[in-house]
C-alpha cells in the first residue's frame, strides 16, 4: 500500500451490525473500496454486547448495567473475554476475509497498544483504556492489512478487562493519532423531537444529558466522542452503519451523522 500524508482512520463498529452478515459484507465492501482508492490506513475497533448478552443468558448469568456500562464481575470476565476477543473478533475477521480483505484479529493488549486500569471497583473487571505503544499496530497497517481490534485489554498485572468499545476506540485513535468514526445502530444524536443534530458541543451535550434526552449507552458514546475530539484535536463523527452507500463519503470526511467538535 502506498503511504499518503492522510491520518489513519479508526472505525468503531458495534450494535446489531455484528449480527447481520449482509450489513457487514456491505460495510467491508465499502472499506475495501475506500482503502484502495484513498490508499489510507484503516483499523476497526469493535464491541459485541449482543453476543455477550446471548452467552450470559445461555449460562443463566445476570446482565447488570450501571450508567450504560456493563458490570463485569471478575468471575465472569473469562466468559465475556471469550465472547468479545474470541467469537465476535473472529466473526468480524472471517467476514472481512470473505470480502477480500487481509484482516488481522487483535486485542487492546497486543504490542502494548493500550494501557488498561480498573475503571471503578463497583463495575468489576471493567477497564479504562489510555493510548499505549502503537508500533506493532503501525507495522501491521504498513503491510496493507486491516486490523480488527476487540475491546478486551490487560492490566499491567495481566488481569483481563472489559473496556467499553467506544472508549477503547478513542484510546486506539489516540495511540495512532488517527481520525475516528463511531458507527452504531442510530444515525447520530437526536434532539428531544427525534431530529438529527449535525453537531454537538460539550455544553449542549451536557444539557441534553441533564434533560434525559441522551440516556443509557448513548451517554457513554457521547462522552467518548467529546473526550476524543478534545484529546485528538479534531472533529469526531457518530453515525450509523445502516446506509452502506453513504459510508465512503463518511470515510472521506463528509458528515452523515453528528459531529463532536473540539472545545
UniProtKB/Swiss-Prot annotation:
Keywords: Amino-acid biosynthesis, Arginine biosynthesis, ATP-binding, Cytoplasm, Kinase, Nucleotide-binding, Transferase. It is found in: Cytoplasm. It catalyses: N-acetyl-L-glutamate + ATP = N-acetyl-L-glutamyl 5-phosphate + ADP. The record marks 12, 221 as: Transition state stabilizer. Its EC number is 2.7.2.8. InterPro entries: AceGlu_kinase-like_sf, AcgluKinase_fam, ArgB, Asp/Glu/Uridylate_kinase, NAGK-NC. GO terms for molecular function: acetylglutamate kinase activity; ATP binding. GO terms for cellular component: cytoplasm. It is an enzyme of class 2 (transferase). It holds the Pfam family AA_kinase. Substrate binds at residues 48-49, 70, 162. Pathway: Amino-acid biosynthesis; L-arginine biosynthesis; N(2)-acetyl-L-ornithine from L-glutamate: step 2/4. Catalyzes the ATP-dependent phosphorylation of N-acetyl-L-glutamate. Belongs to the acetylglutamate kinase family. ArgB subfamily. PANTHER family: N-ACETYLGLUTAMATE SYNTHASE, N-ACETYLGLUTAMATE SYNTHASE, MITOCHONDRIAL. This is Acetylglutamate kinase. It comes from Vibrio parahaemolyticus serotype O3:K6 (strain RIMD 2210633). The gene is argB.
